[in-house]
């Protein structure tokens, strides 16, 4: 009888939100406390507390969310099952990673691996530390895949916020884990202890966000193949639950488009090729990989901020009015936040895995493009492309500095080649989009000086560029095979420029614009071929 009375009193108390929140806070504190206890007891405390934290958050989320089951067709049922399988896999993998980290900390094996992301053992027992990293890596991949699926087929704000928090926290805690490795090389210290707590705290918070996501996914209705448009789909014309399940269009694609990946591809090509023509010889693949990742993210960040700053221009231009921000599919501040975050991550990657000079050069290109070109010159001067083109010429400097750790006259020559390539390339497009630029109030050269003067300037800059491309063999930088290839490619460039000067048709402008993209790629590839085959 007494036991029944206790149950009647205790259960209503336990169902209240504040009790569950208190339980979650206690569990979170126990997770952090477990990392301080230098025995296996600490690992047990952290592991159990992590499970309790997940249970408390699941309970609280369930209490605050009304279950709304729906009948689904076979296709939607399969999609829901696949989504939940991925979500549970991510939750389970992250829990194992947290437990493995706690075990390593308690056993004192966390710092046996003195490198990252691989493992260069400094003592015995390195496999537990490497296993922890492997679990964390797999968890990160699963969370990233879950984020892509969530943005693709789920339009509920709560689910998207939860998965975004989980992915963001996971990426940050990975960076903190790297910082721990660097700090551990100097032995135990206060910064290392702080980093250890931060690392575990971020992991536990990411785990909590995933638990909330899974609970919401279980209780919220899954989009059916034939469902009425929701407010989220109404805000995005043409997007229904059917197209969400089919993945067209997707918000993920919109966010990727903010970074202008097509433009970045050519920039990164000049970065990579410049790495293979330095006096230092062929670089290690890992150096090329980290330089590529850092350079790509830095360029992505600058382009995203450019989309934020140019939103008033884009809406007045036919070519850009369908972009995510002017069309209303993405809030403008998202582009700004994305750009800042990508820039910070890129700088950290380049500074840690490449060298500080490379990171600073990439950051200089970032600010050159955002501040000097986008904010200042693009809106105020007919020379916006001439001077602003220097931003696109930074990638060869980044590649050269990544390998040599310094800059040389040869690297500056590569910068000049891209600098003088930019005006003919972009003015060809500006001639085609002249009315758009005039309507948006952008003082591009065709708008200010007219078509005839623009075509004349294209020829002049083309001749200057071709003269610069002939200098590498004369300076002993490259051989005569390069000069032969550069002459052929450059001769065709000059042909299109002169043809545009003569007839001024839109078709010729398009031909020059498209060939200019191919030309720059061929020119830098020719440099590598000359060095690799004929040197």
Swiss-Prot record:
Location in the cell: Cell membrane
Residue span of region Protoheme IX prenyltransferase: 264-535
Disulfide linkage: none
Record's protein name: Protoheme IX farnesyltransferase
GO molecular function, one term: protoheme IX farnesyltransferase activity
Membrane topology (UniProt): Multi-pass membrane protein
Further details from the record: Carbon 2 of the heme B porphyrin ring is defined according to the Fischer nomenclature.
Function: Converts heme B (protoheme IX) to heme O by substitution of the vinyl group on carbon 2 of heme B porphyrin ring with a hydroxyethyl farnesyl side group.
Family, as annotated: In the C-terminal section; belongs to the UbiA prenyltransferase family. Protoheme IX farnesyltransferase subfamily.
NCBIfam families referenced in this protein's UniProt entry, alphabetically: cyoE_ctaB, PRK04375.1-2
Keywords, comma-separated and alphabetical: Cell membrane, Heme biosynthesis, Membrane, Transferase, Transmembrane, Transmembrane helix
Reaction(s) catalysed by this chain's protein: heme b + (2E,6E)-farnesyl diphosphate + H2O = Fe(II)-heme o + diphosphate
Pathway(s) it belongs to: Porphyrin-containing compound metabolism; heme O biosynthesis; heme O from protoheme: step 1/1
GO biological process, one term: heme O biosynthetic process
InterPro entries: Protohaem_IX_farnesylTrfase, UbiA_prenyltransferase, UbiA_prenylTrfase_CS, UbiA_sf
Entry EC number(s): 2.5.1.141
Any one of the GO CC terms: plasma membrane
Stretches that traverse the bilayer: 18-38, 40-60, 83-103, 127-147, 163-183, 197-217, 262-282, 285-305, 334-354, 357-377, 385-405, 412-432, 474-494, 509-529
Region (Unknown): 1-263
């Amino acid at each position: 009888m007494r036991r029944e009375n206790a149950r009647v009193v205790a259960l209503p108390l336990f169902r209240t939100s504040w009790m569950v929140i208190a339980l979650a806070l206690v569990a979170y504190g126990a997770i952090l406390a477990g990392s301080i206890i230098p025995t296996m007891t600490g690992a047990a405390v952290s592991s159990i507390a992590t499970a309790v934290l997940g249970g408390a958050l699941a309970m609280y989320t369930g209490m605050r969310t009304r279950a709304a089951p729906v009948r689904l067709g076979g296709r939607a049922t399969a999609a829901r099952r696949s989504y939940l399988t991925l979500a549970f896999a991510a939750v389970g993998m992250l829990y194992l990673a947290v437990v493995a980290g706690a075990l390593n900390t308690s056993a004192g094996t966390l710092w046996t691996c003195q490198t990252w992301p691989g493992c260069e053992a400094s003592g015995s027992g390195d496999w537990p530390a490497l296993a922890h990293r492997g679990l964390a890596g797999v968890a990160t991949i699963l969370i990233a895949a879950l984020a892509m699926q969530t943005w693709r087929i789920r339009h509920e704000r709560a689910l998207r916020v939860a998965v975004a928090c989980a992915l963001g926290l996971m990426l940050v805690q990975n960076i903190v884990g790297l910082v721990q490795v660097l700090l551990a090389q100097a032995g135990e210290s206060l910064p290392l202890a702080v980093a250890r707590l931060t690392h575990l705290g971020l992991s536990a918070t990411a785990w909590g966000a995933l638990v909330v996501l899974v609970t919401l996914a279980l209780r919220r209705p899954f989009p059916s193949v034939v469902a009425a448009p929701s407010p989220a789909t109404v805000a995005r014309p043409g997007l229904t639950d059917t197209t969400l399940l089919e993945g067209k269009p997707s918000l993920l694609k919109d966010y990727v488009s903010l970074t202008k990946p097509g433009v970045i591809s050519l920039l990164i090509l000049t970065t990579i090729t410049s790495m293979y023509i330095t006096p230092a010889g062929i670089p290690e693949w890992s150096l090329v990989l980290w330089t590529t990742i850092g350079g790509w993210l830095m360029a992505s960040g600058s382009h995203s901020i450019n989309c934020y700053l140019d939103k008033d221009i884009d809406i007045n231009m036919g070519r850009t009015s369908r972009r995510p921000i002017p069309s209303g599919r993405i809030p403008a501040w998202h582009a700004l936040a994305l750009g800042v975050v990508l820039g910070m991550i890129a700088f950290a990657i380049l500074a840690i895995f490449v060298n500080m000079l490379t990171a600073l050069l990439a950051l200089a290109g970032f600010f050159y493009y955002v501040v000097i070109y986008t904010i200042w010159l693009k809106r105020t001067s007919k020379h916006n492309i001439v001077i602003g083109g220097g931003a696109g010429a930074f990638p060869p400097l980044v590649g050269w500095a990544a390998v040599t750790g310094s800059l040389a006259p040869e690297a500056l020559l590569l910068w000049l080649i891209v600098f003088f390539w930019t005006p003919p390339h972009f003015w060809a497009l500006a001639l085609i989009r002249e009315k758009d630029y005039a309507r948006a109030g952008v003082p591009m050269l065709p708008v200010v000086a007219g078509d005839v003067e623009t075509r004349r300037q294209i020829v002049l800059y083309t001749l200057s560029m071709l003269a610069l491309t002939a200098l590498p063999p004369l300076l002993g930088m490259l051989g005569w095979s390069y000069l032969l290839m550069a002459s052929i490619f450059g001769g065709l460039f000059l042909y299109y420029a002169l043809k545009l000067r003569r007839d001024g048709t839109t078709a010729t402008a398009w031909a020059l614009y498209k060939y200019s993209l191919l030309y720059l790629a061929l020119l830098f590839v020719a440099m590598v071929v000359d060095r690799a085959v004929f040197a």
